């Protein structure tokens, strides 16, 4: 049986049976206990907006993006200006970003977030688990991306990166 050919009692042929069964499971779970994730985009946004703790001082929802197609975590690169005009500082990388803006045509400006005590070598970070999240700070390094190139976003708990 291929996609769309599975039959479940009470589910019409036009409906996706896996989708319907998962909906039924969620409905049943919601009847038993509040179905709330401790960490999710919704929770991070609520924390940022102070809905869970007003006046908490949080200002950023850090995100990790996953490239469409291979579904691998996206690592951004950039550098600050060097010590003088026309010079480039040390190249840095990060899997974790602060969304600065999103345009109508789904392009976004992302700022690299890093722990200043984490080594800055670009080869050091092979995947998001290699990156320290203990003391993320804004870097001032921004990149522009096409959001149509991503298939997944992970929101980390809301934090404060500005003093």
Walk through the language-model features, giving the residues of each.
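Short glycine-rich, low-complexity segments
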Residues: 1-163
